[in-house]
């Protein structure tokens, strides 16, 4: 009886499928990383078993790829002990097809590597002079502020034109916003007509320096703005009838300082290191003592546990014309504790 012959076509088909499988495996083998470090190694693993084409299809400038198909233990050793994966291949060698996002452009650096740098569109800016930013800093122009926003402060905006001021005099706020001065004697533009949502938790309650309990930070801001003078935050939670600072629990590393003038406590940030700068201006405090700076005054208050506030700039024994101007502004009761409200 004749034996059945093996068809050579079937064997060829099997070999072809095997080669295709191996080719697919080699194309898929590899690891995708989110960045290439300065040491040349890949760091921050994004996904395993990706081909270079799949890994680099995102268009991210920092994405890199390694072709080694290794086990989890090796990956762990690379990331923890070796500073990243070796043989790191960056997806982008040039700026071609690189998407840096709004306000940024791709440029080749000194090492001939593509990098995304801040390059905001300043062509439509009409005011070329100084501007005061929401961070209380003066910028040489709006374009410089936009660059600062791009680098590290995404919420940064222009408050008003001109340098940042210590009074509301000559400050022109845009739109319906109003100029007020916070507890650090910096002028800000704020809007009062904000609708505050109802509080969803009792933890949102705040006690104001006026002894009134406010449902939320939004309600305290709005009340301050409508009142046109400083209220300020005493402490978190509902107001209590405290006899001393022992009855008040401060959070967030704050310390209770007692205000003998009104018989209430106030939680304040302490432990701030005062800079050794000769440019700091002395201040006259509410205890009629002169301190080298506002920071030195706060330091003394934290040390004694008694609240101190700035009466005016300069020595208590000499009131300058500028101080009289400031007192004139204080009579208008422009003071808004933005810094004390927004810090939490």
Swiss-Prot record:
Keyword Cytoplasm among record annotations: no
Pfam families xrefs: FOLN, FST_N, Kazal_2
Domain TB: residue ranges: 30-103
CDD domains, sorted: KAZAL_FS
Primary location class: secreted
Keyword flag Glycoprotein: yes
Gene Ontology CC terms: extracellular region
Organism lineage: Eukaryota, Metazoa, Chordata, Craniata, Vertebrata
Domain Kazal-like: 112-166, 186-241, 261-318
Annotated region described as Disordered, given as residue ranges: 316-344
InterPro entries in the record: Fol_N, Follistatin/Osteonectin_EGF, Kazal_dom, Kazal_dom_sf, Prot_Inhib_GrowthFact_Antg, TB_dom, TB_dom_sf
Alphabetical GO biological process terms: cell differentiation
Record note on quaternary structure: Monomer.
PROSITE patterns to which the protein is assigned, alphabetical: KAZAL_2 (PS51465), TB (PS51364)
Residue stretches of biased makeup (Acidic residues): 321-333
The entry's keywords: Disulfide bond, Glycoprotein, Repeat, Secreted, Signal
All copies of domain Follistatin-like, residue ranges: 94-117, 167-190, 244-268
Cysteines paired by S-S bonds: 32-55, 42-88, 56-91, 95-106, 100-116, 118-150, 122-143, 132-164, 168-179, 173-189, 192-225, 196-218, 207-239, 245-256, 250-267, 270-302, 274-295, 284-316
Name of the protein in question: Follistatin
Glycosylation sites: 124, 288
Residues making up the signal peptide according to the UniProt record: 1-29
Described function: Binds directly to activin and functions as an activin antagonist. Specific inhibitor of the biosynthesis and secretion of pituitary follicle stimulating hormone (FSH).
Subcellular location: Secreted
């Amino acid at each position: 009886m004749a034996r059945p012959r093996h068809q050579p076509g079937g064997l060829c088909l099997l070999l072809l499928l095997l080669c295709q499988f191996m080719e697919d495996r080699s194309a898929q083998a590899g690891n995708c990383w989110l960045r290439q470090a300065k040491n040349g190694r890949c760091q921050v693993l994004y996904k395993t078993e990706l081909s270079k084409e799949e890994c680099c299809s995102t268009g991210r400038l920092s994405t890199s790829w390694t072709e080694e198909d290794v086990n989890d233990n090796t990956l762990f050793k690379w990331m923890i002990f070796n500073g990243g994966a070796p043989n790191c291949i960056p997806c982008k060698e040039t700026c071609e097809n690189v998407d840096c996002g709004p306000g940024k452009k791709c440029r080749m650096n000194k090492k001939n590597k593509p990098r995304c740098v801040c390059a905001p569109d300043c062509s439509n800016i009409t005011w070329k002079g100084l501007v005061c930013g929401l961070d209380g800093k003066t910028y040489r122009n709006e374009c410089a502020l936009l660059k600062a926003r791009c680098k590290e402060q995404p919420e940064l905006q222009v408050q008003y034109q001109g340098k940042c001021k210590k009074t509301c005099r000559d400050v022109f706020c845009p739109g319906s916003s109003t100029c007020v001065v916070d507890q650090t004697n910096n002028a800000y533009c704020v809007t009062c007509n904000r609708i505050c949502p109802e509080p969803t938790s009792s933890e949102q309650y705040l006690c104001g320096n006026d002894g009134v309990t406010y449902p939320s930070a939004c309600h305290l801001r709005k009340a301050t703005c409508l009142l046109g003078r400083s209220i300020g935050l005493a402490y978190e939670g509902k107001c209590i009838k405290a006899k001393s600072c022992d009855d008040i629990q401060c959070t967030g590393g704050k310390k209770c300082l007692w205000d003998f003038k009104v018989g209430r406590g106030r939680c304040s940030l302490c432990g701030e290191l005062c800079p050794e700068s000769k440019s700091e201006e002395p201040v006259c405090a509410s205890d009629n003592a002169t301190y080298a700076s506002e920071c030195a005054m706060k330091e003394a208050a934290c040390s004694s546990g008694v609240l101190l506030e700035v009466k005016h700039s300069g020595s208590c024994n000499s009131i300058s014309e500028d101080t009289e101007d400031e007192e004139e502004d204080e009579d208008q009761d422009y003071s808004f504790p933005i810094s004390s409200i927004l810090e939490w």
